[in-house]
Structures are given as C-alpha cells and as structure tokens.
Amino acid sequence: MCGIAGIISFQKNLTEEELIRMRDSMIHRGPDGSGLWISENKKVILGHRRLSILDLSEKANQPMSNEDGSLQIVFNGEIFNYQDIRLELEKRGHIFKTDHSDTEVIIHSYEEWGFSCVEKFRGMFAFAIWDNNKNLLWIVRDRIGIKPIYWTKCNNKFLFASEIKALFSNPEIKKEVNTQSISDFLSILTVPAPRTMFKNINKLKAGNMMIINDKGDIKIEKYWDIATFLNNPINDITETEAIKETEKIINNAVKLRLISDVPLGITFSGGVDSTLITAFMKKNNINDIKALTIDYNIKSKYSEIEVARKISKQIGFNLQEKTINENDFALGIEEYTNIQNDYPAGDPNTILMYLISKRVKELGLTVILVGEGGDEIGGYPYYLKINDEFKYLNLFNSLPQFLKNSLYNISPLKAKKFLGFGIGDTVISRTHINGFTEEEKNKILLENSYDSSYNIISKLMNEITTEGKDLFLRKVLNVEYKNRLPQLILPRVDYPTMANSIEARVPFLDHKLVEFSARLPFNIKMKDREAKYILKNILSNYISKDLLYRKKVGFGMLLTNFLNFTVPKWIQNELLNKTNNPIYYFINKNSINKLMYLHTKKLCYGYKLWILYSLKKFLDYHIVDN
C-alpha cells in the first residue's frame, strides 16, 4: 500500500520539486521510503511513497522499470495472485530482478499482454505505467474501487495522485468547491465518480482505465462492469451448489490476502462477515490471530462486546479490546481531518475506523483484514425491506392520479416521505438516500438550482434490465457496487487506515466472489427471508447457532445511538458558531437551528446534524481558497 503521483507536461520542462511536493503530502500512505523518476526530456515525472508489505528489499522500491528502462511504474495496492502470474511470465522468458515483488509482475505483464493484462490481476490496485516507446501514460483502477486515483489538467499539464490533497499541493491547481457535489453529499453522503467535491478534480471510476498521450489526449475505457453479471443471473443452480462454490471462493480469497511479509490482523465486530473471515484465517493455519474489537464507554443495549468474546473463544483466538468515549471520538475527528480532507466524513464510521486503525498500529500490525463487502455478497437485511417497498411504490405509481392525491391528503407528511421515491415511471431505492431528501434540501440549501441527487440512483438502477422477480434487488446491487461501495464505504476504509499507515484488505470484494454472488438468485442468497443465508450456512460449521442467529447491530449502531441520543456539545457549538462559519455560505442558518430544536424533542436528528457538521469541518479546511 502506497501513495503515487505523477505529472506530464505538454510544453514546459518539469522540475523534481513539483513532484516532491505532491508525493510527500501523502507521507502517511508510505512512511517507509520514497522514490522519483523523471524522463530525459523532463516532460514526465513519477513519484512514490512506500509502505513496505511484500518484498521489503530495496530492489522492490518504486518507481520501478522493466529491463531496458522503457517502462516505468508507480503502484498502490496488492496483486494477490502475483505468484501464479510470475510463474507464467517466467515460462515465457521474462527475467525478474526482485525476489517476490508484485509491482514487477505488473510491469512484465504489461510487456507481455498490453492493456489486457489487467484481466489477470486479482487484487486491489491503482497504478500508472509510462511507456516511453509509445509516449503514453496508462492509469488503471481496480474493478470495485478499493484503491483511489484522482486526476486533473491545468496549464498544459496532466497530474494524477492517490489523494486530492496531493494535487492541491501544486500551486497551479485552483481549489474551488463544487456546489452540485455539496447537494449530492447532503443526500447520499458522497459524490459520484468522476466528480469530486471540487471543480475540475476528477476521480477515475472503478473498473476503468485511462490513456494519456504526449499531446494531452485522454481516453477513458471501462474494462469491467458489475452490471454484466447482474444482468446474467444463474437460474439453474441448486442451494447446495451455491453454498459449496461460495465457500470455496471465500476461502481462497482469504488465503490470498494472508500473503504478507509484515504482521497482519483483523478488525472484529462479532458479526457474520468478520467472524467468517476469522474462521477462514484459522482454517488457513493462522493460529495466532490478532483481532481487534471496539466498544463505547456508554451504557447501551447495542453493545456486543460479550458476544465478540464468546465467538473468540469458540473459534480460538485472542481478542484485543479498545474502549472509546466521547472525548476519544472528538479527538479522532480533529486528528483525522488534519490528515485527510479530500471529502467530508459523512459516515461517522470513518472516524471509528481511524481510531481502530490507530490502535492496530499500536499493536505493531501493518495489515488488517476487514469485512466490508459482506453485506452486498450475502444479502443485507434492508434488502428485504426495500424489496417490499418497491412493490408498494409500483402499486402507487399504477394508481389513477385522483387516488394518489387522496393518499397524499390523508397523511401528507408520511406520503411525501415514502412515496417521494417514485419518480415518474421510475422507482428508486430510498435506502441510498442516507441523508436529506430532495424536499428537505430545498428547505435548507440557500440555492435550489441543483440537479436532483435521485437521478444518480435512477440512472444506475436503469442499467439493469434482466427479467425476473429479482429485478429490483439487482438494480439496488448495481447502485451498491457502483456508488455506495466505491464512493462511500471503501473510502471510509482506505482513508482512515492509510492515515495511520495501515493496509486494509477486503476479502469479500475479491472480484471472483463478487461476480459469482452477483449472478446468484436471491431466493437462495436470502432463503426464507433470512439475510446472509449462504454465509450463515457456511459459518454454522464454526460457531454455535445462538451466536450465529442473533440480531446483529454492528460497529455503527452504537455510533448512531451515540449521535441520536447525545449529539455532543462540540457538534452543536461548531454548527451554531456565527463567526466566519463557512457552512452558512450554502446552508440556511435557521434550518440548522430548527434541526437542533427538533433533536431536543427526541426526534433523532443526530445523524443529519452529523452530516452538516462533517460538511462544516470540510469547508473550514477548504473554503479559505474560494
């Protein structure tokens, strides 16, 4: 895991100092070393910050070249099946200078297979290869979007980096907040790629590659699409076959992600996902499992620390526990936002992951396995709920207009809240509107000339056209994989872990598992309306039924409970601060006062207040440059 950056100039010569500023703004992503390469004509420069995970030798440093120096690569991530690919390349006559660097495997793969080599890679990655013979730069992002990559063009230059802050370290890049992105953030807690929170700063979409030539022409292509698999369901598979194949792929995915030359562990919540990963770690002979769980220093029915302890005894591993309180959380916000400020921390679990990874670092670990992606693979409980809602919304849309009006008149508030997610002939999943609805935004935003954030969801849902009773859920999964995961869930893993120089690996987002699961029918994945039916069936071989079939709340439920019923004074004070408060450039201050008032009436507006608070912290950092 590392930080990468680069510049191509189409006119003036480049200096090393330009790249060093970008590279070293991301020192947290790679504290173990740094490298730089500049072309003979001074028109191309690449930089790298290294976090040493595989092949700790100096020979594995980056930027790395091929044998004749015609190719240069900078790479962030891991290719977990690099050993198999290396064997194939060696049989084809390739000679390697490193002992076991996956970076060198990428560059030789490009030599052998060109752009199609990416189809062989099983892992998480964002890399850039400069091909001196063809005078082009090739940038690739992994299929699911686990690793980020950003780019911009300015003053006859093309710049890219692992983080937006690296781009802004170049004084030529103007920082201007994108107000449409603020509107989208308020609804979906993120911004759909290729947009970011800033004008003219772009994020390469997951499963995409881009080619930039020495004239400045840019070509972006999609090399992988989850919709291909969602639109091609397997209808003739049995339950036994589905369970057996899922178990086989998960076991292999975990096994591959145990390859490391540095200590590794796992974040453990006691839920199905992290428990299953831990069980397979044990199965693959990791006997000294270092697992970390977290608890809150508040009295709550949502605490699952006792459950986590029982599971650790049944599987057989030592559980490291960390308890945090309100002050820890407040301090974590300040520490995190001083390191990472590309996006607002709209999901408070971002801060939780920062605190967890900080403790992971204290334990001497460099790599952790995490359970993200298990919900999408297994079938999350709310999928059942939104599938039911889909039926009701479709029924509502089919009614004559006078009946629709009658329903609105009977209970206008509830009707608007629920039925507002039927847009013309299209019904969207309201579960993807985690924040403010369009109607709510119209009341709080000072300007209302933004495109509806619902259109983002609607467009993605319309990509799925397969027939059958699973249609709506397949549409929902397309949104999950193309928006919620790469733009919200995975950044809340990558950013806070990398802020502590920790590499997070995501076994449930192994693309082979994602592809297979996406094609499975939901009557098997969620048989008898049991969420994660297949995963629980597999896990039943490792833990007792009373622990397996309990109601799961997860790390985040305690945090939601914490926000809804306490809303710390520091959140209130910052939002209501009238002195140079940048949020008032966009949000009506009276609406914030109203939310505060409603929250005091026990109406649970804590999460929405957090969204506004995180936006305020983001604007505090950036608005000075507008």
Outline where the language-model segments fall.
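Short low-complexity, flexible loop/linker segments enriched in glycine and/or proline
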Residues: 334-338, 383-386, 562-564
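Alpha-helical "lid/cap" subdomains adjacent to substrate-binding clefts that gate access
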Residues: 396-418
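Adenosyl-5′-phosphate
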Residues: 1-4, 21, 95, 116, ...
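Mobile, glycine- and charge-enriched loop segments
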Residues: 330-349, 445, 449, 460
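Short acidic/histidine-rich active-site segments
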Residues: 365-381
